[in-house]
């Protein structure tokens, strides 16, 4: 939004051109989102408390969680709002990737908001039915995946990049690309949702992964860097650098209030939209495999639920004391802060491993 104003002012003073630089806009986007989050966070929490919009705790969960009952939830609205405002201020409105991310955020944020609203209205831990939730997520994923295919200008954009190997890309074709994108979007959205069970557990991995994706987006969108590093050049993806920076700022601002002991939870409105936009950004820069690596904490949480449910249905026994995985460790007596920090550490290590793929190939 400011780019037009900046270009106009640059006609009178060339110094304004510095605000056109991608790195400058990314820094300003991150700082703006962080500032908005910190300024609005306390007011937002007070409003949630006033209207008694609090977390509903499962009675069959860890007993230590009962004290969290009534903690303000739907904090994902704060993340979504500050993220989108920052992106719209500092982003390039002529870049189609910006609008793909914005629309994805709105679609999955709306699904999550509806789910949270039903839980609060009925004072139950059950929101949307599984079938409706899965159907709406699927429709959203199909729409976004199809949109990405329609704007693809090069066959590279429908190939799967294999990290750590030089010039290795797997042709998917349009159908293969749509199928992969569908599973990445729906899977990532639900994985972050399942992980969001402890204070700050989900948001820090999202921040760390966003940081890595910002680097990959910047390199992929820069012809000289991508050529030197032997990374496929994808024009326009550099704008995702600004978007990732805004997400980092919004995430850090939320973590200020969400860190243990949390003053607010993100709810499904936050987790579903965060997982979805991580997936979409990854798809746009063709780094799906690296998302799987960096997001292994999310993957492990999801697999623990799938394994637990499948095994119980077949043998009427449980493999884990409780699923998702973080609850299993709680049941074993590990403190919540220790679980959270260790999951953060695992994510940080895997993010660094993924970043190593820039040079190791």
Curated annotation (Swiss-Prot):
Cellular location(s): Cell inner membrane
Membrane topology recorded in Swiss-Prot or TrEMBL: Multi-pass membrane protein
EC top class named in words: transferase
Co-factor requirement: Mg(2+)
Residues annotated as transmembrane: 26-46, 70-90, 93-113, 131-151, 168-188, 200-220, 237-257, 264-284, 289-309, 338-358
InterPro entries reported in the protein's UniProt record: Glycosyl_transferase_4, PNAcMuramoyl-5peptid_Trfase, PNAcMuramoyl-5peptid_Trfase_CS
Main location: membrane
Pathway(s) it belongs to: Cell wall biogenesis; peptidoglycan biosynthesis
Any GO CC annotation of this UniProt entry: plasma membrane
Keyword terms of this UniProt record: Cell cycle, Cell division, Cell inner membrane, Cell membrane, Cell shape, Cell wall biogenesis/degradation, Magnesium, Membrane, Metal-binding, Peptidoglycan synthesis, Transferase, Transmembrane, Transmembrane helix
Catalytic activity: UDP-N-acetyl-alpha-D-muramoyl-L-alanyl-gamma-D-glutamyl-meso-2,6-diaminopimeloyl-D-alanyl-D-alanine + di-trans,octa-cis-undecaprenyl phosphate = di-trans,octa-cis-undecaprenyl diphospho-N-acetyl-alpha-D-muramoyl-L-alanyl-D-glutamyl-meso-2,6-diaminopimeloyl-D-alanyl-D-alanine + UMP
Purpose of the protein: Catalyzes the initial step of the lipid cycle reactions in the biosynthesis of the cell wall peptidoglycan: transfers peptidoglycan precursor phospho-MurNAc-pentapeptide from UDP-MurNAc-pentapeptide onto the lipid carrier undecaprenyl phosphate, yielding undecaprenyl-pyrophosphoryl-MurNAc-pentapeptide, known as lipid I.
Family: Belongs to the glycosyltransferase 4 family. MraY subfamily.
Name of this chain's protein: Phospho-N-acetylmuramoyl-pentapeptide-transferase
Source organism of this protein record: Ruthia magnifica subsp. Calyptogena magnifica
């Amino acid at each position: 939004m400011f780019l037009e104003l900046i270009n106009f002012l640059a006609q009178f003073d060339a110094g304004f051109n510095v605000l056109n630089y991608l790195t400058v806009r990314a820094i300003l986007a991150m700082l703006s989102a962080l500032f908005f989050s910190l300024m609005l966070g306390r007011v937002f929490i007070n409003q949630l408390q006033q209207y008694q919009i609090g977390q509903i705790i499962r009675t069959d969960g860890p007993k230590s969680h009962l004290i969290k009952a009534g903690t303000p939830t739907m904090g994902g609205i704060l993340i979504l709002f500050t993220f989108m405002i920052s992106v719209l201020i500092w982003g390039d409105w002529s870049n189609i990737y910006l609008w793909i991310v914005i629309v994805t955020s709105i679609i999955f944020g709306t699904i999550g908001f509806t789910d949270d609203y039903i839980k609060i209205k009925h004072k139950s831990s059950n929101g949307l039915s599984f079938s409706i939730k899965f159907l709406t997520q699927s429709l959203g994923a199909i729409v976004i995946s199809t949109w990405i295919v329609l704007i693809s200008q090069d066959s590279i954009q429908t190939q799967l990049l294999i990290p750590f190997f030089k010039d290795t890309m797997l042709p998917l074709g349009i159908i293969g690309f749509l199928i992969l994108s569908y599973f990445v979007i729906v899977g990532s959205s639900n994985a972050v949702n399942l992980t969001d069970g402890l204070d700050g557990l989900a948001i820090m991995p999202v921040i760390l992964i966003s940081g890595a994706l910002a680097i990959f987006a910047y390199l992929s969108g820069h012809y000289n860097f991508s050529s030197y590093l032997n990374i496929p050049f994808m024009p326009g993806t550099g704008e995702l650098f600004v978007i990732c920076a805004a997400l980092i700022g919004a995430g850090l601002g939320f973590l200020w209030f969400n860190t243990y002991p949390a003053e607010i939870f993100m709810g499904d409105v936050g987790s579903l939209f965060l997982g979805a936009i991580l997936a979409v950004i990854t798809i746009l820069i063709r780094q799906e495999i690296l998302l799987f690596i960096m997001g292994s904490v999310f993957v492990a949480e999801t697999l623990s639920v799938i394994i637990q449910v499948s095994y119980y249905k077949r043998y009427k026994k449980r493999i884990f004391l409780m699923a998702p995985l973080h609850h299993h460790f709680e049941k074993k007596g590990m403190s919540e802060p220790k679980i959270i920090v260790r999951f953060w550490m695992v994510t940080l290590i895997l993010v660094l491993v993924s970043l190593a793929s820039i040079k190791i190939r």
